């Protein structure tokens, strides 16, 4: 970065064409010869601004969002400033010239004060792990800068380019909506206490909790701490005046591999293109950026056309609108919206806007906001994606494209190409090498012309289409009534049916169109059209994209929707002609999806006499996280080398040879290390030593590390890693759980649990059912990928800074791999950007890689896994297959369960034994079953080793259980809630593993939820809705959970803590747990503050480190507060006991003075606390009758969810979810409610949206947010109510509390079971009353095909 003296002086500044100038957070930046291959994210992080996070590198998570501001000239030659949120990971550094960049650091910080957005997100508990937070704040900030008069609904719909895995989104939305300048069309949602709370102050009716301080007060006023107040724009930083006068000239930047051009005229652009015909045109880099990053494609010449006036204009013409090819999708949408709005009161003009409305309807679901803000219409067309959202719309509309080039004399030559001739084959279009796309002409719609667009994807927001389409028909009155459209019949004069996702390119259906033209618009044409669509849109078995039956049924289902939509309009036009009558039951099929404003409430109980325990105190690091000052591993400012693993590209193969010679010659490369370079033991198995750090002979999964490349930068190491040549001898691979079962590929391990007398159970049963149920995998998708920084010290000392839930295990295995003592390795961290179990063991192998490299290089080495590497190598939640047999009475009482559980462990054990054990323990969920026989087996496959994930096998077993409960309900014709109630454990009843269920809150939770959710009234309303609607169906389900709390391995139920009290009265706490967003540090601070009776501000936690607290258990199993809290309390009590004699002599002195007096008296004010959970531990026996008690106590909860499905597409919406969870006396209701909401949404995603797809070759297809879909802002329940059960103290844990992280996750499956009820209602329309299997997750494909109507049956294999 160069700061030229003229930049800040008064003399004219003359910039060279190889210099890049922009403003960064208000300061001028000038770079000589910038690297054309650098993204904005790469550059900004390289200069030490770490608020932008690298979450995915494909523009789909929003962690790297920043605000880009620039001056735009309008048609009337006026200038306006445009602010937009864009993705730093894709937006090129070289495209910033003349613009202003604002990152999170430019908004506010702790020292100078928080921006109002930062403050409200922080105060409203909108940040847990914090990794996604800066990006979310910048998305909101940019939106409010551009849209200061936004409604709450406008704001709520702005986050489609951002993801959060922790919060469940509700607190973020509440904080964001407080900036609305005006209410939405719907009733304004007032924002109550943070979190939106109904507070029940136990034991003191006169006191309330002040939302500002979290302390008791007596004002008796529940005042919102989050004001409903717009952002004050006049106090925001102004756009740099320097840039208002900045002359945008041509640029040329030359890098080692790529040359970047920014021309200013069309002639200049065409001249470059004529000379360099292979040049790529880049506007937003949203496609080229993916190709260069993930496919290692190098484009030597890049041309950025955003300064060429002809390409950035939009013009109205007599017959339509002409859009310049470089116009962004957001700009186009805004322009078209303006046309529509201006003609709202002009019926004739408004009828011309049909195509514009169709485009806007598709843009709503096109990628995310940040991508639309950068991507251009021309780029979308020229990419020619076969699953494009917009191309079918433009095909149907009859758009015309203009190409332009220079002839040999330098004259411009233009060529018109109708869009139906533009797409030639897969990603090949009719553009000559010297041509560019100049503009797109979009015609107006004509009278009696109807155009409608549709799209179905796995997730509504920011997802690629499974099928997209657009239909246009031009009707004319039949001759005898042509003089008057009233009461007339109509026939089709012209039509286009355009589809994406059904061929290698976007296509039209010529045969169907030909059949339709001349036909009378009536129901009779539907059957013929559907049959012709079948032949027009063939898909062979095994076609790319899969889902053959589903995709084909969408083609006809969408046309049926379109037919109803047009008919409904014709019914009005024709004055009620019965030919066009759409029945009341059918009408909802024509409704476009429109999400109401979300809302809800959070209820909890506090106990003022326990302050600060039970108080809603915000996250300790919230302010740091909202300002971007919270540091994660990759943010540590230390010069280091970078390591990248070299993976096996085969799922099962002997490694015959490895040649790194070419890689070692690449720029910046320092070394290549493999198994022969490991000084200690080549083993990183966390429990059973069956994993190699680097493969010695045989790769056991696709992605297995063969070695690592070390280079000066991550990009250099990544590129060089692809140059390592590996010769394989491929071996047969097992890549699915079904394949493992059929081939008997199991680990030599089984666990059996038996209770009662199975023969007696069967004999007492009036009915016996059996079946099989499959539970899919789930990717953790923590926003911060795995990362480690290893710093060598004196001799063989190493400091390992790792994003891990398991510092002690990391320390131990790194020491073993290096052949040194654990006393020479310190593992430490401040926080993780999410974990969810995925960093309990799988983080360790990347730490070992960095440690090996650092050991040899004698330099700091950093390894940060790219998202695709992380997802494809670190394992998932275990998928399960269950085979069950259940006996029950005619009254619904369950008598016997025979269950076989098969879990896919992957290629190694990892901690799969513990996962399977917990699944076995939770196979009965909340129900007393007197006779059980449960066998668990681990399948061995050539896939990444699966690992811990929130719930640790419990959710898989419980969803299996609830599936057969539904089958019991179906068999008996009883409501499923009655089956559940009838079989609940009663107080002190004993489980199959011989543990008494004491302090049983299940029935109480259930009964309260029945009332709070209005279950019975809503069940009636759902039935009424289903009778009145044919193609939209609703379902409602109420689901319980009983979750055992403890590690099932006895040894892990221990914790340590170190507490220091200083003479100024402040306290430093260190404990063995890791902070990953769950608020553990905040709770530990509360416990220490309570013990010493000091404000929470006097207690501080800096980090977790193995040289402060050694030999710790991983932060997992939802008991970290239980374990570490007791250890902290123990240390505090030791110190207090030592202080007591001094206190007795000085009873009235403040705590600070007491500390000084203790020091004077030589009292030790430091203590090492320890806690071990008593009376826990369980050992399975071959007989099936084990020994011990696996759990310290149980959590109880229940959730009721109501959904609506579209039976023609499989789309679903969660209308309402009510959750009640027993957390004892909550240590911190704000934290705990956040955990409940986040876990619920994660569980909802696991059981509905999130599908891990692995090819038969072992290659994982879902390796990033573009292919793997976690819930987004749009997916959370529209009404979301969460309550913490009151008056339920738990005598088994710290301050009568309970752990909270895992138990709520399974309750998200209430959405899955509500979907099942809705599908059942849909099947009844087709007289299908038999049981049907609905495997988990209930994806849109499974929902649609399970509805089993004629549209599905048309394509079902016989």
From Swiss-Prot:
It catalyses: xanthine + NAD(+) + H2O = urate + NADH + H(+); hypoxanthine + NAD(+) + H2O = xanthine + NADH + H(+). Coiled coil: none annotated. It is found in: Peroxisome. One of its GO terms (molecular function) is 2 iron, 2 sulfur cluster binding. Substrate binds at residues 840, 918, 952, 1048. It comes from the Eukaryota. FAD binds at residues 281-288, 366, 376-380, 389, 437, 455. GO terms for cellular component: peroxisome. Keywords: 2Fe-2S, FAD, Flavoprotein, Iron, Iron-sulfur, Metal-binding, Molybdenum, NAD, Oxidoreductase, Peroxisome. Mo-molybdopterin binds at residues 805, 836, 950, 1117. Pfam families: Ald_Xan_dh_C (PF01315), CO_deh_flav_C (PF03450), FAD_binding_5 (PF00941), Fer2 (PF00111), Fer2_2 (PF01799), MoCoBD_1 (PF02738), MoCoBD_2 (PF20256). Homodimer. Residues 253-447 form the FAD-binding PCMH-type domain. GO terms for biological process: xanthine catabolic process. Binds 1 Mo-molybdopterin (Mo-MPT) cofactor per subunit. This is Xanthine dehydrogenase. Residues 18-107 form the 2Fe-2S ferredoxin-type domain. Its EC number is 1.17.1.4. The active site is at residue 1302. InterPro entries: 2Fe-2S-bd, 2Fe-2S-bd_dom_sf, 2Fe-2S_ferredoxin-like_sf, 2Fe-2S_ferredoxin-type, 2Fe2S_fd_BS, Ald_Oxase/Xan_DH_a/b, Ald_Oxase/Xan_DH_a/b_sf, Ald_Oxase/xanthine_DH-like. Its cofactor is FAD; Mo-molybdopterin; [2Fe-2S] cluster. Belongs to the xanthine dehydrogenase family. It is an enzyme of class 1 (oxidoreductase). Key enzyme in purine degradation. Catalyzes the oxidation of hypoxanthine to xanthine. Catalyzes the oxidation of xanthine to uric acid.
């Amino acid at each position: 970065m160069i700061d030229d003296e003229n930049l800040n002086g008064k003399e004219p500044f003359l910039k060279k064409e190889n210099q890049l100038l922009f403003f960064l957070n208000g300061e001028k930046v000038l770079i000589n010869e910038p690297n054309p291959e650098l993204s904005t994210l790469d550059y900004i992080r390289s200069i030490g601004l770490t608020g932008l996070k690298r979450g995915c590198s494909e523009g789909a998570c929003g962690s790297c969002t920043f605000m880009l501001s620039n001056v735009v000239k309008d048609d009337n030659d006026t200038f306006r400033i445009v602010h937009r949120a864009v993705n730093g990971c894709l937006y090129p550094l070289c495209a910033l010239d003349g613009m202003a960049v604002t990152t999170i650091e430019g908004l506010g910080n702790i020292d100078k004060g928080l921006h109002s957005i930062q403050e409200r997100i922080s105060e409203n508990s909108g940040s847990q792990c914090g990794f996604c937070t800066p990006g979310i704040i910048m998305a909101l900030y940019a939106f409010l800068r551009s849209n200061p008069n936004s409604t709450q609904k406008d704001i709520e719909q702005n986050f489609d380019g951002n993801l959060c895995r922790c919060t469940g989104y509700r607190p973020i939305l509440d904080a964001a909506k407080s900036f609305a300048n005006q209410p939405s069309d719907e009733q304004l949602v007032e924002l109550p206490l943070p979190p939106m709370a109904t507070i029940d102050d136990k034991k003191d009716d006169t006191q309330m909790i002040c939302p500002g301080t979290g302390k008791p007060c007596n004002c008796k006023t529940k005042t919102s701490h989050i004001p409903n107040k717009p952002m004050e724009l006049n106090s925001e930083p102004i756009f740099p005046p320097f840039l208002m006068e900045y002359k945008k000239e041509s640029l040329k930047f030359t890098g080692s591999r790529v040359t970047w051009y920014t021309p200013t005229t069309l002639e200049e652009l065409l001249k470059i293109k004529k000379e360099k015909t292979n040049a790529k045109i880049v506007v937003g880099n949203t496609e080229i950026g993916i190709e260069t990053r993930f496919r290692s494609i190098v484009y030597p010449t890049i041309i950025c056309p955003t300064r060429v006036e002809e390409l950035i204009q939009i013009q109205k013409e007599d017959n339509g609108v002409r859009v310049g090819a470089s116009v962004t999708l957001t700009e186009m949408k805004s322009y078209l919206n303006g046309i529509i709005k201006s003609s709202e009161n002009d019926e004739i003009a408004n009828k011309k806007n049909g195509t514009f409305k169709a485009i806007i309807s598709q843009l709503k679901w096109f990628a995310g906001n940040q991508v639309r803000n950068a991507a251009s219409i021309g780029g979308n067309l020229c990419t020619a994606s076969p699953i494009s959202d917009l191309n079918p719309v433009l095909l149907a509309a009859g758009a015309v494209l203009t190409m332009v080039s220079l002839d040999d004399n330098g004259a411009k030559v233009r060529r018109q190409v109708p869009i139906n001739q533009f797409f030639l084959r897969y990603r090949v279009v009719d553009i000559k090498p010297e041509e560019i796309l100049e503009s797109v002409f979009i015609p107006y719609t004509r009278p009696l012309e109807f155009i409608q667009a549709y799209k179905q994807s796995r997730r509504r927001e920011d997802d690629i289409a499974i099928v997209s389409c657009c239909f246009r028909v031009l009707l004319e009155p039949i001759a005898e009534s042509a003089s008057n459209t009233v009461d007339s019949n109509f026939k089709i004069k012209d039509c286009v049916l355009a589809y994406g996702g059904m061929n290698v390119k976007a296509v039209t259906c010529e045969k169907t169109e030909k059949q339709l033209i001349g036909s009378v618009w009536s129901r009779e044409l539907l059957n013929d059209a559907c049959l012709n669509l079948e032949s027009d849109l063939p898909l062979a078995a095994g076609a790319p994209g899969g889902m053959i039956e589903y995709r084909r049924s969408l083609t006809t289902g969408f046309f049926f929707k379109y037919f109803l939509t047009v008919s409904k309009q014709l019914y009005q036009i024709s004055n009620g002609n019965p030919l066009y009558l759409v029945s009341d039951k059918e009408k909802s099929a024509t409704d476009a999806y429109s999400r109401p404003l979300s809302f809800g409430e959070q209820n909890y109980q506090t106990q003022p006499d326990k302050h600060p325990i039970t108080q809603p105190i915000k996250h300790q690091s919230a302010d740091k996280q909202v300002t971007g000052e919270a540091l994660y591993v990759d943010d540590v400012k230390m010069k280091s080398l970078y390591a990248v693993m070299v993976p096996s590209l085969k799922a099962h193969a002997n490694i015959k040879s490895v040649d790194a010679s070419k890689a070692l010659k690449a720029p910046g490369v320092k070394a290549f290390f493999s198994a022969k370079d490991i000084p200690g033991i080549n083993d990183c198995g966390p429990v059973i030593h069956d994993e190699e750090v680097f493969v010695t002979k045989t790769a056991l999964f696709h992605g297995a590390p063969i070695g690592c490349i070390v280079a000066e930068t991550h990009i250099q190491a990544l590129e060089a890693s692809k140059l390592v040549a590996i010769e394989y001898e491929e071996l047969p691979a097992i890549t699915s759980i079904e394949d493992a079962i059929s081939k008997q590929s199991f680990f030599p391990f089984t666990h059996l649990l038996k209770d009662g007398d199975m023969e007696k159970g069967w004999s007492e049963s009036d009915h016996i059912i059996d079946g099989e149920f499959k539970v899919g995998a789930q990717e953790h998708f923590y926003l911060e990928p795995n990362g480690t920084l290893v710093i060598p010290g004196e001799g063989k000392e190493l400091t390992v800074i790792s994003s891990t839930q398991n510092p002690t295990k990391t320390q131990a295995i790194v020491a073993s791999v290096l052949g040194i003592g654990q006393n020479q390795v310190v593992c430490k961290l401040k926080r993780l950007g999410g974990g969810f179990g995925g960093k309990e063991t799988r983080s360790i192998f990347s730490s070992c890689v960095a440690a090996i490299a650092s050991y040899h290089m004698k330099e700091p080495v950093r390894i940060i896994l790219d998202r695709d590497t992380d997802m494809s190598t670190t394992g998932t939640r275990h998928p399960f297959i269950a085979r069950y047999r259940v006996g029950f009475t005619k009254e619904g009482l369950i008598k016997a369960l025979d269950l076989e559980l098969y879990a896919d462990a992957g290629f190694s054990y990892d901690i799969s034994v513990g996962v399977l054990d917990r699944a076995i323990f939770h196979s009965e969920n909340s129900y007393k079953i007197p006779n059980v026989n449960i066998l668990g087996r681990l399948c061995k496959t050539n896939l990444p080793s699966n690992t811990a994930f929130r719930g640790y096998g419990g959710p898989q077993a419980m969803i299996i259980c609830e599936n057969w409960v539904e089958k019991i309900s179906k068999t008996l014709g009883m409501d499923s809630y009655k089956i559940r109630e009838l079989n609940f454990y009663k107080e002190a009843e004993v489980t199959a593993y011989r543990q008494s269920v004491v302090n049983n809150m299940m029935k109480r939770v259930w009964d309260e939820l029945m009332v709070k959710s209005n279950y019975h009234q809503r069940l009636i309303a759902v039935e009424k809705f289903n009778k009145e609607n044919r193609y939209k169906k609703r379902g409602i389900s109420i689901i319980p959970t009983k979750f055992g709390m403890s590690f099932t391995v006895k040894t892990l139920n221990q914790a340590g803590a170190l507490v220091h009290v200083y003479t100024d009265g402040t306290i430093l706490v260190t404990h063995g747990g890791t902070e990953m967003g769950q608020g553990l540090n905040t709770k530990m601070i509360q416990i220490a503050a309570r013990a010493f009776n000091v404000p929470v501000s006097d207690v501080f936690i800096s980090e977790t480190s193995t040289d402060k607290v050694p030999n710790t258990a991983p932060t997992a199993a939802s008991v970290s507060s239980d374990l570490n809290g007791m250890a902290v309390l123990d240390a505090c009590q030791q110190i207090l006991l030592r202080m007591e004699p001094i206190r007795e002599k000085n009873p009235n002195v403040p705590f600070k003075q007491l500390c000084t007096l203790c020091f004077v008296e030589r009292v030790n004010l430091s203590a090492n606390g320890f806690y071990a959970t008593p009376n826990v531990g369980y050992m399975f026996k071959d007989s099936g009758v084990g020994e011990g008690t696996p759990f310290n106590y149980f959590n109880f909860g229940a959730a009721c969810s109501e959904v609506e499905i579209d039976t023609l597409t499989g789309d679903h919406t969660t209308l309402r979810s009510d959750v009640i969870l027993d957390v004892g006396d909550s240590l911190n209701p704000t934290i705990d409610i956040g955990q409940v909401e986040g876990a619920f949404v994660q569980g909802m995603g696991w059981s509905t949206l999130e599908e891990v797809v692995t090819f038969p070759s072992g290659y994982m297809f879902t390796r990033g947010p573009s292919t793997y879909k976690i819930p987004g802002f749009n997916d959370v329940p529209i009404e979301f109510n969460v309550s913490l059960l009151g008056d339920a103290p738990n005598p088994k844990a710290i301050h009568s509390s309970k752990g909270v992280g895992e138990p709520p996750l399974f309750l998200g499956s209430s959405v899955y079971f509500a979907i099942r009820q809705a599908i059942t209602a849909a099947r009844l329309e087709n007289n299908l009353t038999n049981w049907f299997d609905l495997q988990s997750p209930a994806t849109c494909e499974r929902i649609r095909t399970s509805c089993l109507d004629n549209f599905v049956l048309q394509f079902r294999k016989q």
